[in-house]
């Protein structure tokens, strides 16, 4: 807005001074006392966009303006010049010139400020580019390699722990199989023990039966002995009675010789009874001895079986105790292994959770670094856009300055030509041409996901 206002003031001042419409545009010229030309160089920036990335193009323009025409025209006038009108016009022109110098000084100050600002922004841009290059070359690769190495180490640890856990599980399964076999053997030994106890109970019943039979036989022997003693006593009493009767009847026997001999009969009877008693006693003793021998043999057999059963029972009891101790030891080992397995599972779960947290934290840091890089790239792009805008504004001010110089030089030439009413065309003026050399620099920056993928710079030279 201020630029347009200054430009309108300058145009209106020239209209007031020289009249007419807008001043024509001529190449930039400089006045000098000697007839030599001067060259003025200006830089025009052209902004073009390629692939959504702004680029900056610079046009360097060189203009050569002859200056001998004004000097020749002024010298060729001679004494015909009339300065009465020129003095009045020069006063107003000097006033306008002074105002324009003040405005040009302000423009120069603003231009210097813009140059300082551009230099500062270029320094900041260089710092940001260096920071982006440092972050691009340092952080992502090194952090990624470090994290990948740590992840590989964690995976190796997890694989080792998994193999160790598999070995522990195999050992646990083997111990469970051994424990199952021992339990099966224990059941078999318990069954054998029960069978031995049943046999022992049967043997005890046989021993009890044999003992009862022996007691019964002993009782029968005692009864037979008592019966034999009773029979002996009865026999003796009968013999005494018979002897008494024989003594009482002795006389009668003697007197009666023809009667049978009772003594011989009694002896025969006694002999018969004694033989019968002896036979019964012998049979009873033989039967008793046979029974006693049978019972003794049966008792010996039962005692041997009982001792064998007791010995087997002691062996089984020792085996049961040893198996019980072994089962208790295996149970303790199994409990310790299960406890170790639970502790290892808990530790592995905690380590896995820590590793997951570390991975999440590292991924978050990577995302943060990518966001920082994207932010730096956006800031770099914004600074580049600001720089291009400032370059465009500087080029605009330069055009305005050149336009002011051209506008100042052209009215003076017209004033001298109208006052002198003289027009001359010098060979230098006829031969002078405006040569424009344009250099186009195209800088292409390709970005992808906030990261700079490639940069390319291209220059084109054209002569107009």
From Swiss-Prot:
Keywords: Cell membrane, Coiled coil, Cytoplasm, Intermediate filament, Membrane, Muscle protein, Phosphoprotein
GO CC term, one of those recorded: intermediate filament
GO biological process: intermediate filament organization; intermediate filament polymerization; skeletal muscle organ development
SUPFAM superfamilies: Intermediate filament protein, coiled coil region
Location of the IF rod domain: 100-408
Site keyed Stutter: positions: 346
Subcellular localization: Cytoplasm, Myofibril, Sarcomere, Z line; Cytoplasm; Cell membrane, Sarcolemma
PROSITE patterns according to UniProt: IF_ROD_1, IF_ROD_2
Region (Linker 1): 134-143
Record's keyword annotation contains Repeat: no
Region described as Coil 1A: 101-133
UniProt modified residues of type Phosphoserine: 7, 23
Source organism, top-level taxon: Eukaryota
UniProt region (Coil 1B), positions on chain: 144-244
UniProt region (Coil 2A), positions on chain: 261-279
Head: region residues: 2-100
Alphabetized GO MF terms: structural constituent of cytoskeleton
Tail, as annotated region: 405-464
Cystines in this chain: none
InterPro entries assigned to the protein according to its UniProt record, in alphabetical order: IF_conserved, IF_rod_dom, Intermed_filament_DNA-bd, Intermediate_filament
Residues that bear Blocked amino end (Ser): 2
UniProt similarity note: Belongs to the intermediate filament family.
Quaternary structure (record): Homomer.
Record's protein name: Desmin
């Amino acid at each position: 807005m201020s630029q347009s206002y200054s430009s309108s003031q300058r145009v209106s001042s020239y209209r007031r001074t020289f009249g007419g419409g807008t001043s024509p545009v001529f190449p930039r010229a400089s006045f000098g006392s000697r007839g030599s030309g001067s060259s003025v160089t200006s830089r025009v920036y052209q902004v073009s966009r390629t692939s959504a990335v702004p680029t900056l193009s610079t046009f360097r323009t060189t203009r050569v303006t002859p200056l001998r025409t004004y000097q020749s025209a002024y010298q060729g006038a001679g004494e015909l010049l009339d300065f009465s009108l020129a003095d009045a016009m020069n006063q107003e022109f000097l006033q306008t010139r002074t105002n324009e110098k003040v405005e040009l000084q302000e423009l120069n100050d603003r231009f210097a400020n813009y140059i300082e600002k551009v230099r500062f922004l270029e320094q900041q841009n260089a710092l940001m580019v260096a920071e982006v290059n440092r972050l691009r070359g340092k952080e992502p690769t090194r952090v990624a390699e470090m994290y990948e190495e740590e992840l590989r180490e964690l995976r190796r640890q997890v694989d080792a722990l998994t193999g160790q856990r598999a070995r522990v599980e195999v050992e646990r399964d083997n111990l469970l199989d051994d424990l199952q076999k021992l339990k099966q053997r224990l059941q078999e030994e318990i069954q054998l023990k029960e069978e031995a106890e049943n046999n022992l109970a049967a043997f005890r019943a046989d021993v009890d039966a044999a003992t009862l039979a022996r007691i019964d036989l002993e009782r029968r022997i005692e009864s037979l002995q008592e019966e034999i003693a009773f029979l002996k006593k009865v026999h003796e009493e009968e013999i005494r009675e018979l002897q008494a009767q024989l003594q009482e009847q002795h006389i009668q026997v003697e007197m009666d010789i023809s009667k049978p001999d009772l003594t011989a009969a009694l002896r025969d009877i006694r002999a018969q009874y004694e033989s019968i008693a002896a036979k019964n006693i012998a049979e009873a003793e033989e039967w008793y001895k046979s029974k006693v021998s049978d019972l003794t043999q049966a008792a010996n057999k039962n005692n041997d079986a009982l001792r064998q059963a007791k010995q087997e029972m002691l062996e089984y009891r020792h085996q049961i105790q040893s198996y019980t101790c072994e089962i208790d030891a295996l149970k303790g080992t199994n409990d310790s292994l299960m406890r170790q397995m639970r502790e290892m599972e808990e530790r592995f779960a905690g380590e896995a959770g820590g590793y997951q947290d570390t991975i999440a934290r590292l991924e978050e840091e990577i995302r943060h670094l990518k966001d920082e890089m994207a932010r730096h790239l956006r800031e770099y792009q914004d600074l580049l856009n600001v720089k291009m805008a400032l370059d465009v504004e500087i080029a605009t001010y330069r055009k305005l300055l050149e336009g002011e110089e051209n506008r100042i030089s052209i009215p003076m030439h017209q004033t001298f030509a109208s006052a002198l009413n003289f027009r001359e065309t010098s060979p230098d003026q006829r031969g002078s041409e405006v040569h424009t050399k344009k250099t186009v620099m195209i800088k292409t920056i390709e970005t992808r996901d906030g990261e700079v993928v490639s940069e390319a710079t291209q220059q084109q030279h054209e002569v107009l």
